[in-house]
Amino acid sequence: MEVDLLHFEKKYHNCIVAGIDEAGRGPLAGPVVASAVIVDNANIITGIKDSKKLSKKKRELLYEQITSNYVWATAIISHTEIDDINILEATKKACSIAVANLSLEPEIVLVDGNMQFKDERFVSIINGDNLSLSIAAASIVAKVTRDRLMLDLSAEFPQYLWHKNSGYGTKEHIEAINIHGLSPYHRRSFRCC
């Protein structure tokens, strides 16, 4: 049975609805990125789904379409702030900033996962990136934005292979940390080796 990715957007059809998702909660290095997207229900881009289910090439193509056709905003919280306030609080902060940065103020904000926010507009949806077009679009924008940042950082620190692992704790990444030590972009609060 195919899922109606506009189910939640239709449920709040009289409201401006934003979807929000993050990329980078689990990596050992780099920032956490949250993106918010307001989908234009009269201009549905085909192929949008959870970023993890798309090839890099398809994500890049959809990123260009989403950012050219929909209202969107992104927020980036650095690795140092993650260490200062913890990854959960950093993620929530990035989500709140991304929503605040939208050029339209949403009345409802659909959030992937089970994070709780004080702002009553925020509605958490477990597995939301598979159930909401807005959240799926946000997952693509967040993932592509973060991957591009990690690609830039990889040019400065190629030994960690961030162009391949995006800062996640792959075997090769951990081996590089054991050989070269931590870079300035590694999260000190994440125990990795």
From Swiss-Prot:
| Domain RNase H type-2 span(s) in chain numbering | 15-193
From which source organism is this entry?
Rickettsia conorii (strain ATCC VR-613 / Malish 7)
Positions of a divalent metal cation binding: D21, E22, D112
Function comment: Endonuclease that specifically degrades the RNA of RNA-DNA hybrids.
Q: What is its EC number?
A: 3.1.26.4
Reactions performed catalytically: Endonucleolytic cleavage to 5'-phosphomonoester
- Which EC main class describes this enzyme? hydrolase
The entry's cellular-component GO terms read: cytoplasm; ribonuclease H2 complex
**Per the record's keyword annotation, is Amino-acid biosynthesis included, yes or no?**
no
Q: Which coenzyme or cofactor does it need?
A: Mn(2+); Mg(2+)
Name of this protein: Ribonuclease HII
InterPro entries the record matches: RNase_HII, RNase_HII/HIII, RNase_HII/HIII_dom, RNaseH-like_sf, RNaseH_sf
Gene encoding this polypeptide? Answer: rnhB
Q: Which SUPFAM superfamilies match?
A: Ribonuclease H-like (SSF53098)
Cofactor, how bound (note): Manganese or magnesium. Binds 1 divalent metal ion per monomer in the absence of substrate. May bind a second metal ion after substrate binding.
| UniProt keywords, alphabetically | Cytoplasm, Endonuclease, Hydrolase, Manganese, Metal-binding, Nuclease
The record's family statement is: Belongs to the RNase HII family.
Keyword Manganese present in the record's keywords: the answer is yes
Give me any GO biological process, just one: mismatch repair
Residues annotated as transmembrane: none
Q: Which GO terms describe its molecular function?
A: manganese ion binding; RNA binding; RNA-DNA hybrid ribonuclease activity
Question: Subcellular location, in the record's words?
Answer: Cytoplasm
